[in-house]
Every structure is written in structure tokens, then in C-alpha cells.
Amino acid sequence: MNAPVKPSKLIKGATGDWEIVIGLEVHAQVSSKSKLFSGASTEFGGDPNAHVSLVDAAMPGMLPVINEECVKQAVRSGLGLNAQINLRSTFDRKNYFYPDLPQGYQISQFKSPIVGEGEVQVDVADGDGVTVGIERLHLEQDAGKLLHDQNPTMSLVDLNRSGVALMEIVSKPDIRSADQAKAYVTKLRTILRYLGTCDGDMEKGSLRADVNVSVRKPGAPLGTRCEIKNVNSIRFIGQAIDYEARRQIGILEDGGSIDQETRLFDAGKGETRSMRSKEEAHDYRYFPDPDLLPLQFDQAFVDALKAELPELPDAKKARFIADFGLSADDAGVLVSERESAEFYETVLSKLADAGRDGKLAANWVINELFGRLNKEGVAIEASPVSTAQLAAIVDLIGEATISGKIAKELFEIVWQEGGDPRATVEARGMRQVTDTGAIEKVVDDIVNANPDKVAQAQAKPALIGWFVGQVMKSSGGKANPQTVNDLLKSKLGL
């Protein structure tokens, strides 16, 4: 049971506060080479109707045959969501007519899904975390795609996507803000990507969401919900929720009532608009698919898949915090994408002393590397600075061979030119000066040349930073910062 909604999450209306209630149905394309009930390819981007079997086209007499890998992927996903795996599930026909659905029905799971209740722990930037309950996860076929811009007088149908396996992941109505909804979908996407069960590519339609939104006065019964169909980006999910909540509040405060309906989100205008009245389950006339036997497996099948699961984001985050003293925020950034976590762990594996420098390595991965990658628009897989090179830079800092300032210069050289960081340090004379006598001479020169600053620093010790900066500048950034600090404190009597 989630805690009451914080006042800051309520929406102010003309008649007082309103609470948003949100549930999401996320459609995640299963990562598999072939479709749910046929051997046709799931490859993205082929010519129209290039990946269509007789089953996908619903030719008479063609029977569906279940793809075992899709079943395994659904079970893996359920385990990753801490959900109940149902050892017996069934397939049903969801009946409706649309040109991109050649069978005249969609094979789905209505009465007995493969995965039951679970939960996802969601962190939000402002600390407004939430546990989102999972109602169910079921397997179903995707539909084809209508193309309206290929011919001026007709719409064309591409069935490449028809029959591709989807996991529909249905949340409970536990979400109370657009930020929570975005964080939930982000976390769900991350989990599926870690598991390798969905690539999460929203631009290609691999992950899309139907967003159910209603509003109510705090503590009142649930309001009438509207469903916003096929929202295909996390940013749009937030925008759609904010607009729809305001729209419903406006209607209710004007004395109107909310019609239960299906709406779409117009990204260009940032608003939702009506598509059709919202269907109920009976509108689809669900009944068991007579061509498919119940899907049954034993607990040993589930246990074998569970034993092969990778470490998931929450467990990895906890380990990074415990083993390397990372902050929750830094650990969260590192585990937010599987590739970034793998990069960091590979850097750790190449460090001379990961226990000593694990936190330093995290700082460099997050602040220097990620910052530069984002600025340049480069994916981490294509990083000009390799894990071995970054580990070498961190080692050089950790063993006091170079200072932090010099390390940033070295990082820039490696980014632009490549090469072995250690060899670069030696070739370019970048080693930090640790000779106390040499540093002391520089300190004495600067202290003697600035008697007014000495008096100010003695009155206000924080001004020692000015002297540190001058010494580092004079030494070309090569002086050992700790030695500089110690000498200055002694010279200034601090």
C-alpha cells in the first residue's frame, strides 16, 4: 500500500486540490528472432511485407505454433519484476476488425496470463519514490501497420509487424504523478534491457504505453478513466498525463462528467483528443483459442531460467554503494543503463586497486566520460576513451603520479589522440611534483609576494584556496595538491 500523496503532487484547481490516478499498460516487443506463432523474421526495417508467413497473413488452414523462446523471455521478465509465474496459462482470441489484423482477431491471454502479480521499486529525482504493483504480464500478437502516405487514394497495409510477440505489462493504479509515471517506464525499460527480453527502443516501437488517467478529490472513490493509446516516448507520457489531468479537472469543475473513452496524444500540439468510446472486455468477445493448447511447464523450467538471470539494477546499485562507497545518486546513474554499468565494472576490473579507487573511477565515468559523451552525442559503446585507458588514468591519480588537473588534460589528449595514458604522461612530462623542497620554494615565493592576502587568509582561513590556486598555476598543475595544502597551512599559521 503506497503512502498518501504528498501535497506537492496534488493539482490545484478552482475548487481545491485534485489527485491524479495513473495506471499503465506497457507493450514491450519480445527480443526473439522469429514471431510468436510463426517462423517469420522479426527484423526491423525490411521492405513492406517482406517478413510475413502464411500464418501471419491468416491464410486458410494455417495453424499457430508457439515459439518457446518467447515463452522463456516472458518468464524471465516476470522473474525480473518479482512476479508470480503461472505454470499453466491459456491463449484467447480478442475479436475486433481492423485492416492491419488479417485474422479478424488477436491471439492474447485474457483469463489466464503467463505472469501474475509483481512489483517495481521506482525512485524519483525529488525523493518521491513509489512501489508500483504489477497486475499481470501476458503474451500477445502485435498487429500490422497501416501506411496512409504511400498512395493518395488508399491506405496500404504492411504485415511485417503482424504476429510479432509482445509482452503487455499491466500496472496497478499506484502512480500519482507524471514524474512517477516517467520514472516507472524508465525503470521498467531498464529491467527488460538488463534481462535481454526487450531492447526498449521506443523510436522503433519496441516499447510503447497505453496510459490510463483519472482524477479525484483526495480520499474520494476512483474517477472515470480515459486511456491514451500508444504513447511512444517517455517525455510524451509525462506531457499526455499533465494535459489529460488538467482537461478532466476542467470538465469536472465546470459541472460536467468524464466519458470513459480512448484518446490519442498529439505530440505536435501537446494535447490529447478523442478517438472512440472505451471498450470493455465483453466488447472483444474473448474466448479460448481452439487452435492452441494450454501453455504448461513445471517449476524446474522456471528455476533453470531464474538461475541464469543477470544481476538486476537494484541489486547492482546496492552492491556499488556497499563495495565502493558510492552515493545512491551516483550508483543510480551508473546502473540506469546496462551499457554504462558494464563500462564501469570493466574499468573496475582493470584498476590496480579497485577497493581504493572504485569511487574515484565512478566520478570519472559519470562526470568526465558521460559528460563528454553527452556533449559530443556519442554512445558509450563508441567511446574514444576505452575502459583500459580510463582505468589507467584513474590509477595514475590514485597512485599520485598525476594531479586531478593534469588528469583532465590527459583525458583530453586520450580522447583526441588515443594512446597509452602512462606513456603519454612520461613523454610529455606530466608527472606531478612531489618534491617538498621544490614545492616549498614556490609556496614561499607566492606567500612573500602577497602579504595583504596572507593577512586576509589568517583572518578568514577559507581564503587559503586562493594561494592553492596560485601555487598550482605556477607549477603548471603538477604540484601535489595535498603537499601544497599542508605547506600553506604551515606557512600561514592555520
UniProtKB/Swiss-Prot annotation:
It comes from the Bacteria. GO terms for biological process: glutaminyl-tRNAGln biosynthesis via transamidation; translation. Keywords: ATP-binding, Ligase, Nucleotide-binding, Protein biosynthesis. PROSITE patterns: GATB. It catalyses: L-glutamyl-tRNA(Gln) + L-glutamine + ATP + H2O = L-glutaminyl-tRNA(Gln) + L-glutamate + ADP + phosphate + H(+); L-aspartyl-tRNA(Asn) + L-glutamine + ATP + H2O = L-asparaginyl-tRNA(Asn) + L-glutamate + ADP + phosphate + 2 H(+). It is an enzyme of class 6 (ligase). The keyword Iron does not apply. Gene3D superfamilies: 1.10.10.410, GatB domain, N-terminal subdomain (1.10.150.380). The keyword Ligase applies. It holds the Pfam family GatB_Yqey. Its EC number is 6.3.5.-. GO terms for molecular function: asparaginyl-tRNA synthase (glutamine-hydrolyzing) activity; ATP binding; glutaminyl-tRNA synthase (glutamine-hydrolyzing) activity. HAMAP family: GatB (MF_00121). Belongs to the GatB/GatE family. GatB subfamily. Allows the formation of correctly charged Asn-tRNA(Asn) or Gln-tRNA(Gln) through the transamidation of misacylated Asp-tRNA(Asn) or Glu-tRNA(Gln) in organisms which lack either or both of asparaginyl-tRNA or glutaminyl-tRNA synthetases. The reaction takes place in the presence of glutamine and ATP through an activated phospho-Asp-tRNA(Asn) or phospho-Glu-tRNA(Gln). Heterotrimer of A, B and C subunits. This is Aspartyl/glutamyl-tRNA(Asn/Gln) amidotransferase subunit B.
